[in-house]
Amino acid sequence: MKTYVLMLAAASFFAACNNADNTKKEGEATKINPASPVIKEESVVYTDGKDTLNGYIAYDESINTKRPAILIVPEWWGLTQYPKMRARELAKLGYIAMAVDFYGKGKIAEDPQTAKEYAMPWYQAPKAAQQRLDAAAAFIKGNTVTDTAQIAAIGYCFGGSMVLNAAKLGSNLKGVVSFHGALEGGVVPQKGLTKANILVCNGEADSYVTPDQIAAFKKQLDSVGAPYTFKQYADATHAFSNPEATEKGKKFNMPISYNAAADTASWKDMQDFFKTVLK
């Protein structure tokens, strides 16, 4: 029974322009025209060592300056339509966004067992996961619209754990945002190494994030002086930001569900966070 509970807990954590103004200095504020965005979408191929990866990029072509880049690490289901939708939403906000392919060749898991098989090796090898994320960062920096000094990452469930671990391990990111990600990532932050600003968006009703885990997470970051903000959303379970969570929860008997209020609030918190850390 203990093994089953731990497996279910792990499952829920993983579930659920080319004509840019070259005179603009990196780090200078992006000029955004939200009234008339022209979103360009690109399916891209990049590599991490010998692995071929299939990412997805979106940005607003109506912006004529370089802009910050935000990487998106998906839930354990892989590169589904959900992280691509989030990339388009970030593009409308004036960023260039890239949905990251963690599993290789754009693989998607159709059921929890397959997703677990895909995700667990990365959870168990945080440095390899950091390298995977760094490969995506290196690729997005090569895009002509990217302000290479302003790179951040967000992650959902499994992806939330991955970006938190990358921040703890010292990835060169301005900030990371974890949406309903596991807090026990197996990485202990070190003083002077964890520099990225951190925002954690956690569902208050997430049965797999205990008060003890929250306290331990905060204590770890406080002990090394890491900059972080921890937000909780009332009545929000695991996977609260994904509109498909309720259906998947019923289909696979998982305690996950969509919460529109928490989704909206956490997205606004993310926007406010990036307005501060991406300048």
Question: Each PLM stretch: what is its role?
Answer:
Residues 18-20:
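Bacterial signal peptide processing site
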Residues 25, 29-37, 43-145, 243-257:
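Serine-hydrolase catalytic machinery in alpha/beta-hydrolase-like enzymes
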